[in-house]
């Protein structure tokens, strides 16, 4: 039984997505009361909260998954405080759950077993910027927008851009991605080094303290072990990231198509032609309609590609020429251009607002995002089949995706008080995930496993790989205190 269905067993009239909680830690008499005093000796009175509103805020993210709040929320201001607090938790066997901005979509911050939430928002400094080396080190409270604002006058930027203004260390923890991944890669290839506090309070530097080479062959890749670990192996307290030069020119375009097939075929052909496109995003007719209504736009309500080209003026001419020829051959419209920064900003804001635009289609309902990713050659087939599945089962699920790397989302909007609809959505998400696995893809391209995809992870990687992961977890966190119940 998947967590999605287990959640129904703990349903309420308002929100059936409630996961059960086994309070095997904090139920021990007096444990929380004793540790709060110890926490305050480290972080001060203002750095510790047991207030119900604060705990509720830090016990949920943007997902449909709902758990009980943590017992305590701490607000460390330095890695030394994180380490000291972790040692207290380790001694009392209290679970630790890291919290960045709460924008995750897989229930990664839920306190399944109670414990202590480490809210890292006060650690918000950009520590070391090396302009000549194109890298920067940040604390976990720095968000992607905050970093790019800091970099505004340097000629550099950090391009990984998930829809929300997520914290950069949270993005590393989930191996996040975004609209620029087709050109600049995901978090996994843009993290050079991490500082991590382990379950017992030990501080680990995954590539060696202060090291930031662009490449290394020195031993096991511990940095990539922690990227995507979702807080289950340790708390990330610093990240050293690659930066990129801001391109000489950027231009965006919108192109409409007569069918889903023709739009996705164009995507595959553009990539196969070797066009170094910076962004290529697909929105189906339902999603375009939602974006139009939410952002007061007037794009044609048909399957659509949002595209962006980066480079020199001369280089972009060739990119645009090839792309226009391909889209025209597939029945695409003439490009509607967005050349100045303000117009491009409105276009990409509409794409980044897709989650909220989808929610606005059915006020009062909840949203759930799928996250499959397949090899790009299988993309036309899976999107067409998925669209047919949505229509056949009367599910509101506008599609948007980073189709340049084979990743797309169905932003499913549903009434959680309607058991028939919940069951139809559950069955659909299971079919979609297994359709992706059958096409040599993955159940999650960028959101992570969290609470809801643990069974699918086992299907995807197999029992032996799960055993290896469990062995790594047991070595680094033998008491299972780091974000228990997630991933594995």
Descriptions of predicted regions:
Residues 2-87, 104-134, 287-295, 341-369, ...:
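N-terminal flexible segment immediately upstream of the FAD-binding catalytic core
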Residues 44-45, 437-449, 474, 478-482:
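Alpha-helix capping/hinge segments and adjacent helical runs
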Residues 49-58, 241-245, 254-259, 264-431, ...:
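C-terminal substrate-recognition/cap domain of FAD-linked oxidoreductases
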Residues 89, 231, 410, 477:
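Conserved, mostly hydrophobic/aromatic
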Residues 125-281, 482:
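FAD-binding subdomain of flavoenzyme oxidoreductases
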Residues 202, 454-488:
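Activity-critical C-terminal alpha-helical subdomain
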């Amino acid at each position: 039984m998947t967590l999605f269905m287990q959640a129904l067993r703990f349903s309420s009239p308002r929100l059936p997505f409630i996961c059960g909680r086994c309070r095997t830690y904090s139920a021990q008499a007096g444990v929380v009361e004793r540790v709060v005093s110890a926490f305050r000796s480290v972080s001060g009175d203002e750095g510790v909260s047991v207030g119900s509103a604060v705990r509720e805020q830090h016990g949920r993210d943007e997902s449909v998954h709902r758990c009980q709040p943590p017992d305590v929320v701490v607000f460390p201001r330095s890695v030394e405080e994180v380490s000291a607090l972790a040692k207290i938790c380790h001694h009392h066997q209290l679970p630790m759950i890291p919290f960045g901005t709460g924008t995750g979509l897989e229930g990664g911050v839920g306190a399944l077993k109670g414990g202590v939430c480490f809210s890292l928002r006060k650690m918000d400094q950009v520590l070391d910027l090396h302009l000549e080396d194109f890298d920067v080190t940040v604390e976990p409270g720095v968000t992607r927008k905050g970093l790019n604002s800091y970099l505004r006058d340097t000629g550099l930027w950090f391009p990984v851009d998930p829809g929300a203004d997520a914290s950069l260390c949270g993005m590393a923890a989930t191996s996040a991605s975004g609209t620029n991944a087709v050109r600049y890669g995901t978090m996994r290839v843009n993290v050079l080094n991490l500082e991590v506090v382990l379950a017992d309070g030990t501080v680990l530097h995954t590539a060696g303290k202060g090291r930031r080479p662009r490449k290394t062959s020195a031993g096991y890749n511990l940095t990539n072990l922690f990227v995507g670990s979702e807080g289950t192996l340790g708390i990330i307290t610093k990240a050293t990231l690659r930066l990129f030069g801001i391109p000489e020119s950027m231009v965006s375009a919108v192109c409409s198509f007569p069918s889903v097939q023709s739009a996705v075929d164009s995507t595959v052909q553009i990539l196969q032609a070797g066009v170094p496109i910076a962004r290529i995003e697909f929105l189906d007719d339902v999603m375009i309609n939602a974006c139009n209504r939410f952002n007061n736009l007037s794009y044609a309500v048909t399957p659509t590609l949002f595209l962006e080209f980066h480079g020199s003026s001369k280089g972009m001419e060739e990119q645009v020429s090839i792309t226009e020829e391909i889209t025209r051959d597939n029945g695409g419209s003439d490009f509607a251009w967005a050349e100045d920064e303000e117009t491009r900003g409105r276009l990409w804001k509409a794409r980044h607002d897709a989650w909220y635009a989808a929610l606005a289609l059915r006020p009062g309902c909840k949203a759930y995002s799928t996250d499959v990713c397949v090899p790009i050659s299988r993309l036309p087939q899976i999107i067409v089949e998925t669209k047919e599945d949505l229509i056949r089962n009367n599910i509101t699920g506008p599609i948007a995706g980073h189709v340049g790397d084979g990743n797309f989302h169905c932003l499913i909007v549903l009434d959680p008080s309607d058991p028939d609809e919940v069951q139809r959505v559950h069955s659909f998400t299971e079919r979609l995930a297994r359709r992706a696995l059958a096409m040599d893809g993955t159940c999650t391209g960028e959101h992570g496993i969290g609470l809801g995809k643990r069974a699918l992870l086992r299907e995807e990687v197999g029992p032996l790989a799960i055993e290896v992961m469990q062995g790594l977890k047991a070595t680094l966190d033998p008491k299972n205190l780091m974000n228990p119940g997630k991933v594995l």
